[in-house]
């Protein structure tokens, strides 16, 4: 029996990266300079002058009638209306993509206002949509910070996963003498590594193979995400590479609490099974929860002694973290050490009603005594209820005033 491949089947997932606004356009240019492969680049902006410097294959002027190519003037509503005017052009440029990265700098006009519109279009086309945005420096002012927060909230509603890079953390990572362009390149590396890592996962065959379906499983409708790549060599190479991959100092989130992790390990012919286990153990311990790890390994002889670890972690929203303690409200009961108060709190009503001891409870002081028919008590001699069977003396007031010693002598 002979088998043949359908020539109409796509040989690989189509990945597109669209930079929206000035910050997004700069990020795309730097990725092209870094020679990122297997991706189609698009730049969209309201500013015609900025578009002239774009190195992307496809360039889109947003809202030519509304803004006349003059930019959004740091007003998000202008950026939004400009993107809405150009919806058809945006849709045509994104057509055919399986995965779309949307990158923008939040807080300004075009990126903040247009990025959510672009994301909505991407989702409507059925593409796996990932947002990678930067939050402005605090010294840029509270108004810009407020615009950024509002834009991020809107974007999050229209993407599958979202990575937020904090510009403030650049001040903690880079040296004081680091040139500005080099500092911003550190932020762009988060996007570049994520895009290149996913592109490599999809296009390069692996010994334990990962494909686009695995990426989609981990990233679809998962909220806040973490993506990172770590490379190291030497005896502790897999430990160092994995720690680098899961600890991006510029991202506003950590892997702690992740529910889904895609982990790919690439090494030379000397990569061992135990190294794959070590990487998985590090990720599992860092996630510190009931994490689902999808593991892949691939061999690349060109790496030599180096090992490369790619991590995509999702499902780490703060709201999900807040709900975690509620799943662990009940604790294991330790006999002879449980206090009365904790028993009351942990004992479910169903157990109280269907207890093996019936209605009897060791906490007698809290039990409700059964009601007794008072009419039946009138027919019972009081002596039967006297615990010590003592007769109640019938004495008058004079006897009470007489000491007991003299009363016995009478």
UniProtKB/Swiss-Prot annotation:
- Which keywords has UniProt assigned to this entry? Cell cycle, Cell division, Cytoplasm, GTP-binding, Nucleotide-binding, Septation
Q: Looking at the record, which segments are called Disordered?
A: 318-410
- GO biological-process terms attached to the record: division septum assembly; FtsZ-dependent cytokinesis; protein polymerization
- Superkingdom classification of source: Bacteria
Q: Where does GTP bind?
A: 22-26, 109-111, 140, 144, 188
Q: Where is the composition biased (Polar residues)?
A: 330-344
Keyword check for Glycoprotein = no
User: What cellular component terms from Gene Ontology apply here?
Assistant: cell division site; cytoplasm
**Amino acid composition bias (Basic and acidic residues), ranges on this chain:** 360-398
Q: What does this protein's UniProt record list under function? A: Essential cell division protein that forms a contractile ring structure (Z ring) at the future cell division site. The regulation of the ring assembly controls the timing and the location of cell division. One of the functions of the FtsZ ring is to recruit other cell division proteins to the septum to produce a new cell wall between the dividing cells. Binds GTP and shows GTPase activity.
SUBUNIT field: Homodimer. Polymerizes to form a dynamic ring structure in a strictly GTP-dependent manner. Interacts directly with several other division proteins.
Full protein name: Cell division protein FtsZ
Protein species of origin: Enterococcus faecalis (strain ATCC 700802 / V583)
Q: What is the lineage of its organism?
A: Bacteria, Bacillati, Bacillota, Bacilli, Lactobacillales
Q: Which gene encodes it?
A: ftsZ
